[in-house]
Amino acid sequence: MSNYWLNIYKPRGISSAQLVSIVKKILGRTKIGHAGTLDVEAEGILPFAVGEATKLIHLLIDARKTYIFTVKFGMQTNSGDCAGKVIATKYCVPSQEEAYAVCSKFIGNVTQIPPAFSALKVNGVRAYKLAREEKKVELKPRNTTIYDLKCLNFDEKNATATYYTECSKGTYIRTLAEDLALSLQSLGFVIELRRTQVGIFKEENAIRIKSPDEITKNALEEKSIKIEAILDDILVLDATDSQAQQIKYGQKCLFNYEKDFRHLAKFAYREEFKGNTERSTTAYTLVREDASTGLTYKLPLEVEFGKMSIDLVWVRYKGTLLAIGSLNKSCFNSLRVFNLTQDFF
């Protein structure tokens, strides 16, 4: 197997780029990417894509993520973590009750200003490079979503609190920590940060690597995860020989979804966030039961005067991933085509 995922745990103290170099050296491969950079001072899940799996990285970047982080109250650093310089102090430590109660204020849609020490670009230059040169960095506010936030532990003696959060892409935990502290009439920065989950990738079965000598290529590949694993909750279409040929050559092709889908239904659902900020959305969902696995898939739909579209589906040919794309009525439009097999026609 040459196209797969690896569930890697990045240790604290090395950059995501350094870990990529280590994995490349072990595997002897150059087509390797990762989903979601972690700061040097952070640790945790960093999914790696090998070979054709790199074409699916954008799906993982969009996936929900979970973190556990510890905030030190009373000080603020220029980087938002312990690697930066202290730029302000305000020794005001919240009570345990306040540290727990503040969480509800942040659940839902929130607006963040990214930290100056970030990989975002300002006029073509990475923000952290400008910040290191002590140049003024102005970044635009960004919208993000906090699905869950709770305090796990409060230590009054050391003026720290540990939190768990589940959030959307683009969420800066350092900014969240600073905003939490400000809401508690204090200052704060992150002293520990661990990413515990990215989509289907969890820390309990992650591979821990610090150097190329710690694991062999064979041992690493034995822990590989099939390329289709992150597509398990996305609608799959099985292509015929003629459909596969059309997709392979970049052509649009038709699928008879009413015939292919064993179970089709539309229903409205509402998603609510509790707290000061509430969001409710209504959409339609396609339900399909896969007879071979017994699993039921739920996909968002746009239904208007008989028009059906699905933003993301994947196509399988002879049991192997062929393409991902969108379905507009019966027409499949490919976004990525994969070269996983030579078994064509």
Curated annotation (Swiss-Prot):
Q: Which InterPro entries match?
A: PsdUridine_synth_cat_dom_sf, PsdUridine_synth_N, RPE1, tRNA_psdUridine_synth_TruB, TruB_C
Class of enzymatic activity (EC top level): isomerase
Taxonomy of origin reads:
Bacteria, Pseudomonadati, Pseudomonadota, Alphaproteobacteria, Rickettsiales
- Record's superkingdom? Bacteria
Q: Which reaction does it catalyse?
A: uridine(55) in tRNA = pseudouridine(55) in tRNA
Record-level GO BP terms: mRNA pseudouridine synthesis; tRNA pseudouridine synthesis
Q: What is its EC number?
A: 5.4.99.25
Function of this protein? Responsible for synthesis of pseudouridine from uracil-55 in the psi GC loop of transfer RNAs.
- UniProt cross-references to Pfam families, sorted A to Z: TruB_C_2 (PF16198), TruB_N (PF01509)
Tagged with keyword tRNA processing: yes
Record SUPFAM superfamilies: Pseudouridine synthase
Question: Which CDD domains does the annotation name?
Answer: PseudoU_synth_EcTruB
* Keyword RNA-binding part of the UniProt annotation: no
Keywords from the named record: Isomerase, tRNA processing
Query: Which GO MF terms does the UniProt record name?
Result: RNA binding; tRNA pseudouridine(55) synthase activity
Name the UniProt record assigns to this protein: tRNA pseudouridine synthase B
Q: What's the source species for this entry?
A: Rickettsia peacockii (strain Rustic)
What family name appears in the similarity comment? Answer: Belongs to the pseudouridine synthase TruB family. Type 1 subfamily.
Q: Where is the active site?
A: D39
